[in-house]
Regions:
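Phosphate-handling DNA/RNA-contact segment within nucleic-acid enzymes
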Residues: 2-103, 107, 115-117
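Replication-associated primase and helicase/ATPase modules
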Residues: 1-17, 27-32, 75, 102-106, ...
Length: 182
């Protein structure tokens, strides 16, 4: 059980074990492969869906041990999503502000989510490349696309064909919001 395990590392992190249940453990490793945090993902409908525990004071970035920042890389919201994309990081949540380098941001496909729309607009205005999912993609995220039967290569092709930056990103974002406003 997740709370009990966490309490062995950080005594009394969870004073009560009520509602404790098994979770998928996702390790967050630094560039040297050392674990600095881990995330527990619920298997069912338990809430919260994700619980992230920091063992060291660092930004919650998954995949630092797997990505080559000297090359173009991708950044998405969830660790599981990042596993399906080559040279990809994941940030805890959708705060991409602290990242540096040549990267493309891949937000979840939630066009009606006001917070994600604000983050997309902020990312575009910052000058970063961004993926704006085409209308035919109905799945919420990369993991759901894979679960629906798409191959890793198909997802990568959709990402490549729907990456925008600068004025093109602003124009496409305006269209994307209108198309998905219903």
């Amino acid at each position: 059980s997740f709370y009990k395990f966490t309490n062995t590392l950080i005594p009394n992190k969870f004073p009560s074990l009520d509602g404790d249940h098994p979770r998928l453990l996702i390790p967050f490793r630094d560039e040297q492969g050392e674990i600095f945090a881990y995330q527990g993902r619920a298997f069912g409908i338990e809430t919260p869906k994700y619980i992230t525990i920091k063992l060291k004071e660092r930004d919650k970035i998954f995949g630092l041990d797997r990505v080559d920042k000297s090359k173009h890389f991708y950044v998405c919201e969830g660790p599981l999503d990042s596993l399906f994309i080559d040279n990809c990081l994941a940030v805890g949540g959708s705060d991409f502000d602290r990242l540096e380098g040549d990267f493309t941001v891949i937000f979840d496909n939630e066009p009606r989510n006001k917070e994600i729309n604000k983050q997309i607009e902020k990312t575009i205005n910052k000058g970063s490349s961004i993926v704006l999912w085409p209308e035919q993609v109905k799945e919420k995220d990369i993991n759901d696309m894979i679960l629906s039967g798409m191959s890793k290569e198909e997802v990568q092709e959709i990402i490549t064909n729907n990456t925008f930056s600068g004025a093109g990103a602003k124009l496409r974002f305006t269209e994307w919001r209108k198309i998905n406003a219903y």
